């Protein structure tokens, strides 16, 4: 059985103080500063960004049992990103300040916006419990005609229960099971009300949860200024004043037909009308489900190339994903015209295309080196298509012919990060704020690939040219999952086929073919340094830098106490020096020689978002090249390998045979 929690709706800072003991459940406890405590702090710090990038609702976990922490975050639909993040940060801080040793807690916060956070040592997503519930009522009473008020009340709440339990918008999971409404009362008063269920409920469960909450409200709070009923899976609140931003553009709608009574006639029993209100929607939903099931099977037979993929963490219920024929791809790319070529990487060439419906896409024509069978290729493509995150490029479809394997991605208009970062005429468009936000976005994307997605994906070729920028300069990681799609085994720690870019690859990968999530961490560290300095790796092979690579150059600046000499001159006068130095510090921790000394992505995220967190002292990094007499012997020992194809620095390596 899932552990039970108490919810609360808050309206002001004073209420937060008055009710601060309510979020914590005194069931099981952890030791302060323990592994569980660290995991709790990490996942709470990650919730704001993940909730906003997953359409208002996100669930995830971090750590290994018995220190694994499960958490859910939610904002109401229509909430602006900054407001959502601010609300979730406030909720997280309240939990951290209040629940000092409890392993289970849940909090609702309601002010101008409303959000919820819940964490536990036990998985709870999808559970449905009506009890316990909690009642909060306003201290002031109101004067009005009781009979007229009850009539308005019943009609309004019945309408809201029906609307909330049927509002299953598939494009935004946070828009499910939510409604806000107003009604005119006697004596020129107005009744404001709001209902919300968590998106993991069924429509029938949401209906039942809200119906019970309305009944509870009638028992506790009628005759008061207002109040709230909160329980495990839903919340209901009504007031005589607009307590949320949703009411600023809302006017009272007419309440026509009187609904069935929601009041229990006998203790412990529902009225006939209430039972009907619960059963009828269930029957209707069941009929609709059966009709849709029959239609979907008929449709699937007619178009086998069309697939619907269920997603449980992306915030999207279904993903429309197509298998396209080669002729369609040829038409879209004008027969792979050179004028449409966007670039070329280790896995193949990329072209811009336009589908017949006008959608612009990026078409990756894979090189014919994969020994993977058609079915295996198709299976891996479908799996990778399930990865949905704001900071990942969307895979929209694929083409599979006897001699062709093609991937179709969303088209990202601002090209790749290196297009701006390494061009002296364009790098000024990336001020420090944009670069810092890009670092944060890449961090969230890799964290999703490593930990929060259905699959554990090691990118293996993380570099500036694989970071695309959308119209708002939000970074989107490209080429993720290519190891799976191309048939490179990611289940083993060693490989004879190295896919990566020299300069971004860590020592253990280049020399011994060993890879892990810490390989991506090393690449990310190099990428952070490039973002700060605005130069490619190979720029540091020039004689005037007195360094053989970027990592060596930065390490010498760090040990000499002059890290800010690394900063791109175009942003050096307008950057936040403390943020820059902290990012350099984090990057040096990422490029440590021993993979065990490199932080994981959840820790990196915490380092970026929590400036008060003390960072460890970095040691000499991997591929640090000593000066003078030691250099030749060092290079000989580090880079001796046999390889069939190898290029210098930033050219992708796709087929190496390490010692």
From Swiss-Prot:
Similarity comment text for this entry: Belongs to the protein kinase superfamily. Ser/Thr protein kinase family. CRK subfamily.
- Residue intervals of the Protein kinase domain: 336-613
Entry-linked Gene3D superfamilies: Gnk2 domain, C-X8-C-X2-C motif, Phosphorylase Kinase, domain 1, Transferase(Phosphotransferase) domain 1
Q: Name one Pfam family in it.
A: PK_Tyr_Ser-Thr
Q: Where is the signal peptide?
A: 1-18
Catalytic function, reaction form: L-seryl-[protein] + ATP = O-phospho-L-seryl-[protein] + ADP + H(+); L-threonyl-[protein] + ATP = O-phospho-L-threonyl-[protein] + ADP + H(+)
Record's bilayer topology term? Single-pass membrane protein
Q: Which UniProt keywords apply?
A: ATP-binding, Glycoprotein, Kinase, Membrane, Nucleotide-binding, Receptor, Repeat, Serine/threonine-protein kinase, Signal, Transferase, Transmembrane, Transmembrane helix
The protein's predominant localisation is membrane
Task: Supply the PANTHER family for this chain.
Answer: CYSTEINE-RICH RECEPTOR-LIKE PROTEIN KINASE 14-RELATED (PTHR27002:SF1064), RECEPTOR-LIKE SERINE/THREONINE-PROTEIN KINASE SD1-8 (PTHR27002)
The encoding gene is CRK12
Recorded GO CC terms: membrane
What are the binding positions for ATP in this chain?
342-350, 364
The protein, known as: Putative cysteine-rich receptor-like protein kinase 12
Active site as annotated = 461 (proton acceptor)
Residues that carry a glycan:
26, 33, 50, 59, 111, 145
Q: Does the keyword Methyltransferase apply?
A: no
Single Gene Ontology MF annotation:
protein serine kinase activity
What superkingdom heads the lineage? Answer: Eukaryota
Gnk2-homologous domain: from which residue to which, for each copy?
Answer: 19-124, 131-243
